[in-house]
Amino acid sequence: MPGRQRRDGGNGPAGQNSNGPEGRDNRRGGGDRRGGGDRRDNAAEKNQLERVVAINRVSKVVKGGRRFSFTALVIVGDGNGLVGVGYGKAKEVPAAIQKGVEEARKGFFRVPMIGSTITHPVQGEAAAGVVMLRPASPGTGVIAGGAARAVLECAGIHDILAKSLGSDNAINVVHATVAALKQLQRPEEVAARRGLPLEDVAPAGMLRARAQAAGGAR
């Protein structure tokens, strides 16, 4: 029958190429490549630092009464200069934290550093929050409050002086700290913009710390 001949023809050499062992192996190989990428991404995410700064319960008044949900402010970083802040909202606390983590990863940014501290003093503002950051010598540690400390530690900054000059609200402090970190510049960028050699822009102590950090990296 014509229909049977068409089905039999699908099992010929052409059919074997698409549905036989070789075709299955090719498809399986492509899946392995994709799976390998996923595994690498998952491994990188597992090595990231996560800090939950604040969890709040909020309510919404509707016709049937009140609907309660939770918000979570989360900091995520790789401990090596990469950090992000996320704000999640859900009916359950774990779901709110997970949403905050995902949002923080989408907003990753790189923090310029020299060794274990920042490149220069800076001040950031967000709403009523004002945070001042100053570089510190090795061994000083992170001198900062809870909300700012979470951001700095996730970014991988080990020596720094931080002071909150405005609101003590955790959300304002976190966003002010992030605003300060985003203002940091590398000495090379400043020297290139001014058209001057690096020695005329960066202090001698910064150059020594930079050289020591480069030597330790080797």
Swiss-Prot record:
Keywords: Ribonucleoprotein, Ribosomal protein, RNA-binding, rRNA-binding. GO terms for cellular component: small ribosomal subunit. The keyword Ribosomal protein applies. Disulfide bonds: none annotated. Residues 48-111 form the S5 DRBM domain. GO terms for biological process: translation. Residues 22-45 have a biased composition (Basic and acidic residues). One of its GO terms (molecular function) is structural constituent of ribosome. The keyword Glycoprotein does not apply. It comes from the Bacteria. Residues 1-45 are annotated as: Disordered. Part of the 30S ribosomal subunit. Contacts proteins S4 and S8. The N-terminal domain interacts with the head of the 30S subunit; the C-terminal domain interacts with the body and contacts protein S4. The interaction surface between S4 and S5 is involved in control of translational fidelity. Belongs to the universal ribosomal protein uS5 family. HAMAP family: Ribosomal_uS5_B (MF_01307_B). With S4 and S12 plays an important role in translational accuracy. This is Small ribosomal subunit protein uS5.
